[in-house]
UniProtKB/Swiss-Prot annotation:
Annotated ranges, domain Helicase C-terminal: 253-459
SMART domains: DEXDc, HELICc
Induction context: Expressed in the late phase of the viral replicative cycle.
The protein, known as: Putative RNA Helicase B962L
Amino acid sequence: MGKPTLLEPGHLYNVPAEHKNDVPIHYIITWIKQRLPEFGGAIPTSLADRVLIIKSRTGSGKSTALPVHVFRILRNENTHSFQKYLGRSVICTQPRVLTAVTLAKDIGASTHYPDMILGQTVGYQTKPLTEKPNRGLIYATAGVLLAQLHTMTDDEIASRYAFMIIDEAHERALGIDLMLMYIKSMLERMLQRGSIGALRIPFVILTSATIDTHKYSTYFGIGKENIILVEGRQYGVETHWPLYNTNNYIKTACETALTIHKENIHDRPTEADILIFMPGMAEIRFLSMLLNNANMDLAKEKLPLMLILPIDSEAIAQENEAYLGLKAEIKNLWVKNPLTAKVEKPLRRVIVSTVVAETGLTIETLKYVIDPGWNRSIETYYPEWAGGLITRPAAQSRIEQRKGRVGRVFPGHFYPLYTKHVFEQIPAQQYPEIITEGPGAIFLSIVVETIKKNKEGVFKAEEIDMLDPPPTDALASAIERAIVAGLLTRGEKGLQLTQLGDIASRFSFLSIEEARMCFSGYFWQAAISDIATILAVVSVADKKLTNLLDSKQRNGAMLAEAVLAGIPPFLQNIDNAYTNIHLLLADDLLEGLFIFEGFQHAIVYFINNKVNNVAKHLREWCEKKMLKYSSMVQILARREDILNELAIVGLNPFHHWQNRLASANAETFLKRVCTLKQCMYEAYRLNCFCYDEHRLLYTGRNGIHFSYHDAVIKNPSCIVTPRIMLSPVSKQYMEWRLEPSFVSVLDGFVNVDINFLLPRQEIPNILGGVEDEEEEPPLPIQVFLHKYVKTHFHFSGKSFKELKMKPGQTIKFPETTLINMIPDIPKNVVQTYLEISVCHQYSFKRLIYCETFYTDMDDVQHENSVELIGLPMAAHHLTINDFNKLYHLLKPDGFLMVYDLHQSQEAFWLHSLQDALGHHTIRRDMDFHTIPEWETIFKECGFTPIFSKQPSEHELFIVFKK
């Protein structure tokens, strides 16, 4: 392989004239050393002293030679390999697992870098795969560095890394944009600390073949002297533009590959491979089938055969046969003749790949690239919050990356399946994901990072410091979701994180809804392992539960055997088991839970029986159940990640393990189903939809509507879904329809606030402040209540009743009288919600939850809400005067506790109390029976008792104020 242009003189641009003929890597290393104090440079005082942008064409060695030579700044290349390196590391991020792993292995095996030994001085770290030294050059996916920046302090990062190289920095994934935001903020904070922080501040290098240097230099506030341009490949690439566009790019790609193969039958196998880009796995499978059929024709003509290798992220993660064929030398590969069934040497490999092969991958035998010009990515539309995989023309920058796969070792050929005129019309750069998808799971991270820079400690949208801020409608939707989830609230000065929001912001990758569902699980005493499993199923199965099936013809009936493998024992012998389970659960997510439980049972069975090669037996088990083994493994990994996330922030990931749905009996099963559905409802409340009998459609508060049909459950009145998906109506036209991803029926399981689902009004100024208005006198108490309040009576665990309550009406329960509460509701109240759950025999901890919704912004917000946590019995003795006093005492902040002494081992409020009291430890076996004893504990932590009541020796009610 020839030298990369970084190692050849005369390929520099945008540098002083006297240096244009320098060896680029020498110039770059000298430029860096001049800014390092240990080499005589000055102490850095600005970002210009620590940020360098290198725009280097494909094939220049920016992913290989550059990181190695940067590492050699820290460790001389002549250092003996047996001498362990103990200094700081160099991390080089890659957008994909394939490139991170491949680059590390290639450098470790290269004779050009004898000092770089895999596992000692060079390695890789990705989420599923790791082989890295404790110190050295580490290739990692962007997500690895992002998680470290999210959880570690500035000093911890600085003590670990001397250099951070962000390769393929032009990619605008959400994680990469957030990572750059973190890096910039970290550099600024360390510079503000003066020489103490600046001495060890990491050096940041951004590299790409197609980076927008003006945009990135403006973002980091650096000048042209911080931008170095390097010429790329040493060999030419001929572009073969077609005269006409194609109407069937898959068929045309096959025909083009076959033409190339036949017209270049004398290619040497070491200079013959073809790479074809496809937007998705479905297209890859179809094209692979066509190419295999073409091999049949080649065999009939007695021509050399092609070896077809379909490659996507799943193939890489599993390191399957196709991936191993990609990494092997062509001389060691064989292909079966479809006529004779004998194996023979292929002339060339035809690699059919998604965008995983677009960047950072060097295939030394690659000579031809065929590009249909399409790219598929997730797009989300607001305020409907509906999204899906949309196929659009790839940007020019992506096409240049694809073209750059050839011409690295010898001259190459590029075959676009679109005309040159079309190429000139498409956008130059790809749209960032924060524009096409919205902030999504990184929203709370954006909020926290923005709040850090705000002196008032509030979130202001105009202060978001990103390459591209989120669109206004996407940001408004994210704020709404965070407020409804109880993670964000509007204080006197602006939007602030709640206590739950502060905890949620510490999660590395959980979305707003996922975090809320976990919190609800703790609140309702659900098994958190079940919550984690459900969230993992949603993440992996994506649109529908049938995506877990390993079959081309997928339908719900095929799930039956997989679902039944994980149901509780008492349900396994009923007639028409799957139909009855489907009818009983009325929930795709719970069926997904049982599918995973069956997979888990299989794992335990094989391990307990000490079978050899557990993975092989699990694959066979999945085949019998018609499940994708890879998907089940992904669910297992995702579930473990969620449980680890909870543990990292200090939450018990095995909370109420005994309440798992799979271990339920006949008496507890429905209660646990209700509990899990309640958690889903609270997490995805904005995605509740009611059935409109007149339109025969499901409608929601955002005005969107869709049809939903189930073969067993006919038109349930209320459903909830994790997301609304865009599904193509046809392959020929750019038309989509809305449909729910997974459906959980709420009828009879959850008390749904119907008024909340009414179409919302368009109210301006969500992102700004509230205009000053004259204070209005309070309205009568009666405006507080809805038209009616749904109230569940649960006496025996078998029967439910629902009462309709008029404004001002007194509700009478056995041993209980609760009347209108909390006066002085402001004029701008548009909705209130009062839910009263009275449970005998079952210790539900949620008693009263009052949410007040205001109209001083565009979206719903909780403010001055009161939550009583504890058993209902403790509140039976509270009068209207007690509640009135409570309301005034709690404003603007306070802590409310309802506690039943018999339930101390399971009281949920201990979690909230632990957080409220900071470092003060609360033992779960505490048994304080009197108010003075509790007052002593709270006083030690700075709380003052302001209201207390002890109706009996077993009941306690105290309010404390900070």
